[in-house]
Amino acid sequence: MKKQVLDTLRNSLLIAAVASVSATYSVAQTSNDYNKRELLWQVLDQSRANDYVPVFFNIHFKDKTGQKAVQSHIDWYKTTHVDFVNVKYEYFPEIQAVSSKKDWKNIKSFAPETWEEQLNVIRQLKHELGHEALIIPTVFSPLRVLIQTAGAQLSSDRDGRRRIVEIIKQDPKAIKPALEAVTKSLVYYIREARKAGADGFYISSQGDDLEEFGGGVFVDVLKPYDRQLSDVAAEVAPFNILHICESGGHFTTKTFDDYLDYPGSIINPPLHNWEGKGLSLADISKLFRRPVLGGLNNRSQALKEGNLTALKAEVDEILKDAPANFIFGADDSVFNDVNQELLRKLVDYIHTWRQTHKK
């Protein structure tokens, strides 16, 4: 408890320091006056709007480990001009193929060396880019990782995933020991990644959003493990994003109620897959009382077609009503084959939008 109080105090002092710096200078927030680390910190200072709009888009990189993975992240950051480095790691070894609910008890925690290749990627990215940009690894939910380690390692393996989901639905409480083991491993990774140079984490919550596991199953079975990752990230790191992943599910306005008590500096919600009337970015910022990351549909037809004019029109509509403290992004990862040169032009347009569109 004492450590959590100290961590909270530390984070408050960091944000206060940013606010002090912001107040000292009368110049606009631009990448000429501050580096991208400072510009992102300024989003957390809710005493003033951020007139520089940071941007975050990400993809699923083909190369997962080694120097190729490091270079893929560097190339994406430098080519697209996004404002922080999101480190993705999506491969988890199969621990135990699950064919019945009796098999859940055989799921054990990962060996520490499982994470070493990923930690090396973080160390190298910190060395190459840490002086100018925040290093923010993605941490996937215990549920997602459990499904992968139980036999559906690839997200494209829909049949495998469906089979495991059906086993879970037979007796959701039976997966608790397996969730405990996986969560323990993910907590270990968060702590080690922080030591390796991570400035914070992109925590991907995945439970209440899945139609198979909404309501009581999420609250009673999944949430205690799901939230634990956000709690640990908040304990060890000052800049964390809570990504509420829709994963093909359908949200209602009540869906967010289960996430209001999660820690996290910034909220990255789904906005384009609602049942009934949805919430706006401003609504969500007010609901969570935090800055929001998002706005663009990651399945945007204009993005798929590479239509910059249409994309700028979408940006205009989003930013004119966006909350004061805001990072522009998408609901989730964009197309892997997105035109990166086009994306850079869009990112540059967004960065200065509030300065070029002043009322």
Model-derived segments and their meaning:
Residues 30-60, 83, 87, 114-359:
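Active-site loop segments of alpha/beta catalytic cores
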Residues 11-22:
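Bacterial N-terminal signal peptides
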Residues 2-13:
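Bacterial N-terminal signal peptides that target proteins for export
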Residues 26-28:
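Boundary at the C-terminal end of the N-terminal hydrophobic targeting segment
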Residues 48-107, 115:
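N-terminal capping/small domains of soluble enzymes
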